[in-house]
Amino acid sequence: MRARRVVAAAAVLLLFAVVAVARLDLDDDGDDSEVLDELLAVDEEEERGELGGGGEAAAAEAVRRAQSMVLVLDNDNARRAVEENAEVLLLGYAPWCERSAQLMPRFAEAAAALRAMGSAVAFAKLDGERYPKAASAVGVKGFPTVLLFVNGTEHQFTGLHTKDAIVTWVRKKTGAPASRIQSKDSAEEFLKKDQTFAVGLFKNFEGAEYEEFVKAATSENEVQFVETNDRNVAKILFPGIASEEQFLGLVKSEPEKFEKFNGAFEEKEIIQFVELNKFPLITVFTDLNSGKVYGSPIKLQVFTFAEAYDFEDLESMIQEVARGFKTKIMLIYVDTAEEKLAKPFLTLYGLEPEKPTVTAFDTSKGTKYLMEAEINAKNLQDFCLSLLEGTLPPYFRSEPVPEEKGPIEKVVGRTFDSSVLESPQNVFLEVHAPWCVDCEAISKNVEKLAKHFNDLGQTNLKFARIDASVNEHPKLQINNYPTLLLYPAQDKSNPIKLSKKSNLKDMAKFVKEKLQIADVETVAAGDIVKDEL
């Protein structure tokens, strides 16, 4: 089995580059297409686990034939290949890079699709780890990197790592921002292959509005744009089209399939329309689309974390709620079985993936929210509405409220207001974290300090500590541990910071001076010094 995977993996590595670089003299396009088909078949068989002994031999032969056509870039030819060809699509990769391995088969499918469309773009690959000089010369700075060179000018691909995204981007950058469809048969064939696209109907392919459409098609890097001047063709692509002579709509493969554009035909407005509407009602969060989710113009984002079987019961309800907040709030699903995706989010809340959970982020402010009510349509609707109106209280992590109080009060996120800011006492607060190297020694000194002042009968002074790794509060923004803060009773908004390098005697003197407690010298020279020794 391992040998099968090695052979199939080799096929995948070469699949993306079987289209010859233009400077290679390959006369037989039929052979190219045949090899593409063979390699794609090998990849599909491997995914289904059907690659048997005969399949291994076929894969090896397909790899051998592909090798004879592929220009592999190195330190000697990389720069020349870019300069001598009008259009070159280059994949910079590293053999150890997991993302490179994931991208290669998708890149291969894009190569096959572009080849079938008659694209003149040439494909090449570069092992950036083996040839760092070449990588630097052509602008490969990380792995994987996809670069398109058009007459020597570099364009970096930043879209989704999918076949369709790569194909759409390359066509836009090489002079085909919109596909022209002029027959019903072509429209029906297009629908078999493309699921998300913007369609424009124009009586004539000219004029200011059409030019703005083309500009938008060129600038929007991910969504395929199509154009037609035939209403019957447009109706196949967008059945709800009315009697307009000029029309623009967005088509998606989901229940909310058709979106009509009602704005002015200006590049900026068209792009905004596409950007706000291109995501589905519920976006399934993946490695591939994470960057697009983070960078979305929709800054209010509501996440549902659940196992797949739990989400099935919630999906239709969430979709219905999402319809009421289209273009305003993005609703996202994260499968908690995908630990790499879910855990970083849940850690921000101090939560475990024990049951379905709904959270929210305002990416423009960096604030987070938690829906603590039962997950149902009404509660989710109210949660989203409050988020939109700005009345939803931010969520801050907190341990459970402690039941008992000791000589040093344990403060948690939920009790920070009552225990510190609203307390009538002066509060000496130790802010620590369990992984902090210096915290243990400081904690021992704080305990001695608390005992000393308690023995003196200082009822107006309270000692407290908070573990900032699991407790948060907007008025406690600490990055260094330990941090010692004195909150005077008369001015809780301006805590006084004490150096963590202070010894026990310095701490006692600091507290007594700031709070104007009598007998400073007596205390400084008394029992507390004995404790320190």
Curated annotation (Swiss-Prot):
Q: What is its EC number?
A: 5.3.4.1
Kindly state a single biological-process term from the GO annotations of this entry: protein folding
Indicate which residues form the motif Prevents secretion from ER.
530-533
A Gene Ontology molecular function term of the record? protein disulfide isomerase activity
Is Membrane among this UniProt entry's keywords? no
**Catalytic residues as annotated in Swiss-Prot or TrEMBL:** 97 (nucleophile), 436 (nucleophile), 439 (nucleophile)
- Lineage top rank: taxon: Eukaryota
Pfam families cross-referenced by the UniProt entry? Thioredoxin, Thioredoxin_6
Q: Which residues are glycosylated?
A: 151
What is the similarity comment for this entry? Belongs to the protein disulfide isomerase family.
Protein name per Swiss-Prot or TrEMBL: Protein disulfide isomerase-like 1-5
Which organism is this entry from?
Oryza sativa subsp. japonica (Rice)
Question: What lineage is on file?
Answer: Eukaryota, Viridiplantae, Streptophyta, Embryophyta, Tracheophyta
